[in-house]
């Protein structure tokens, strides 16, 4: 992350929806700085750090994460990813690649939503067995879609690989053996983590493996750097 910042990424001080964005910014060697907001402790989980400025940033749809790049002010995590990716030709080139990008982008968000609902549910322990029972079927679909390709759009790295890496990693933390039956997914994870800029970031002080979720979550809410 360069000190000569041009972009500003705003989000909670967790991985959450911003991890894939951070990875893409690092991979593309984009100059940026972060504005991290802290959620208060239980029982109130005070969000005033964010709420005090939420409507003062001139955002069309005020929310986290946001990206400020000069006159361009963007919310929605996938819109931010696409904005960065377009600058580096990472949205797919052929029609087939673009179709695969669109499919996996939305499939990942469905997958992420399921995990988020589980992690924030007061019935977390009750619902966890069903999630774990259905997880292999979910992962099998990703494995079959990837097939023998190096990346999820084909043989060229696109922004959806950053999204997919993140959700697979979250599930790998949730259930450490979940990828064992899917060698192509494990190879994808290794391939992604071996990218020079990604490897450097994951080994840096800027990266924290946890918390994935905010403090009111039932899982993934503890800091582990």
Swiss-Prot record:
Gene3D superfamilies from the xrefs? 1.20.1050.10, Glutaredoxin
PROSITE patterns for this protein: GST_CTER (PS50405), GST_NTER (PS50404)
Q: Which residues form the GST N-terminal domain?
A: 5-92
The UniProt GO MF terms for this protein read:
enzyme binding; glutathione binding; glutathione transferase activity; identical protein binding; protein homodimerization activity
Query: How is the protein modified post-translationally, according to the record?
Result: The N-terminus is blocked.
The UniProt entry, under Pfam families, shows: GST_C, GST_N
Q: Which residues form the GST C-terminal domain?
A: 94-212
Leader sequence range is none
Q: Which reaction does it catalyse?
A: RX + glutathione = an S-substituted glutathione + a halide anion + H(+)
Impact of changing residue 120 to F on the protein?
Answer: Strongly increased catalytic activity
- UniProt family annotation: Belongs to the GST superfamily. Mu family.
- Description of how the protein assembles with itself and partners: Homodimer.
Name this protein carries in UniProt: Glutathione S-transferase Mu 3
Taxonomy, top ranks, is: Eukaryota, Metazoa, Chordata, Craniata, Vertebrata
